[in-house]
Curated annotation (Swiss-Prot):
Lineage of origin: Bacteria, Bacillati, Bacillota, Clostridia, Eubacteriales
SUPFAM superfamilies in UniProt: Glutamyl tRNA-reductase catalytic, N-terminal domain, Glutamyl tRNA-reductase dimerization domain, NAD(P)-binding Rossmann-fold domains
The keyword Flavoprotein is assigned to this record: no
Domain comment quoted from the record: Possesses an unusual extended V-shaped dimeric structure with each monomer consisting of three distinct domains arranged along a curved 'spinal' alpha-helix. The N-terminal catalytic domain specifically recognizes the glutamate moiety of the substrate. The second domain is the NADPH-binding domain, and the third C-terminal domain is responsible for dimerization.
Function (record text): Catalyzes the NADPH-dependent reduction of glutamyl-tRNA(Glu) to glutamate 1-semialdehyde (GSA).
Position of the signal peptide: none
Name recorded for this polypeptide: Glutamyl-tRNA reductase
Organism: Heliobacterium mobile
Amino acid sequence: MFIFVVGLNHKSAPVEVREKLSFTEAQLSEALHKLQGMAGIEGCCILSTCNRTEIYGASTDMEKGMTAVKRFVLEWGQLQPQDFSKYFYVHTLYDAIRHLFRVASGLDSMVLGETQILGQVRTAYQRSCNEDCSNGIVNTWFQQAITVGKRVRTETGIDQHPVSISYTAVELAEQVLGGLKGRTAMVLGAGKMSVLTLKHLVAEGVDKIIIANRSVEKAEELAKSCGGEAISFADVNHRLEEADILISCTAATHYVIRKSMVEQVMDRRGGKPVFFFDIAVPRDIDPEVAQVPGTHLYDIDAMQHVIDRNLAERRKCAAEAEIIIEHEINQFMRWLNSLFVIPTIVGLKNKGNQIKEKELDRALCKLKHLSEKEKKLVGSLASSIVNQLLHDPITQLRHYAASPEGHLYSEILQNLFCLDVPGQRQKHVVVHYPAVEQRQNRA
């Protein structure tokens, strides 16, 4: 059984190509069953997100399986044959395992180390199982990938260094205030950035949220989603005194928070500090606000320094993650190689027994004078010779099955002995084995 991944992502294809091979929830069920019904596909899973569409599969015939998937993506996406070689990547065996493990760990994402992808991998796998389109190998592959993704985040802390502006603003607020529980936050704006900011505020346990927007209706929609309160911009001056934190992300072309307003607010607060986070471009908050006693102003440039530092930390964590992934790949390869080895051993024994039976029948036809007891003795002798001849190859094959290149030894043995192992003797399939290649390069 061979495993593979065929896909395209934000690095390999522009959005106008990616959107052609995207799937709605309803389409995924149809697509999975169409794939599963194609010749050469034993199990499959489709991972479809904003930045990638990937088809993971297992096949007993690599050539048939790859042909089927190529036909599927070209038909579904209404793409031309030249698009496949231009925009798609194909990984098999070791490289396929590594790819999924890195994807689940957030190392192949647009935002290094992001956490959302692990949930998307889990959802894709669960959908494949629910549609009865997975198989034993795909099950083990994805289950281990999910485990690897969790392990990478737990052991490296790669997701503990925020690199989005909205998250960084909330994270900074938590750090300077020593936590957000019991605090009141005001958010200006009701766009995408505000939605993300509110999500992070809720996750950090902020006590009260006030959302201000020019359109109160939009603010009310957001307030319902987070248990907050909606107000108009006209009310900001009177309500700001309640807030410990203000995060502003409007689309205004002028300052919406001015020094004079903040001076009045701070007088009413009795000097109790307020932390301002301006994540808008152009800026929403007059820089002179920072001159008002008790205020602390962070604009997008100040937060970018934090993001740059955190991104450097994530890169360090990613290097640690690659070591974990390499270990997990070797573990999975040992298991996968054992699946190749067992049929090879069975095929080798069958080949030996076939030769034994054929030659034994031929010999006994010429030795008709032998008694039944003597014929049994000759048969036992033939069996003993076959078993002893096969003992060393089988023992060594079992030993090498635990190595990353175990499949290579299995395939060599199949070719040397012309073994009939269904679905495993592949023509024109090039498989790379890093451990073998490294030794060859050193030699």
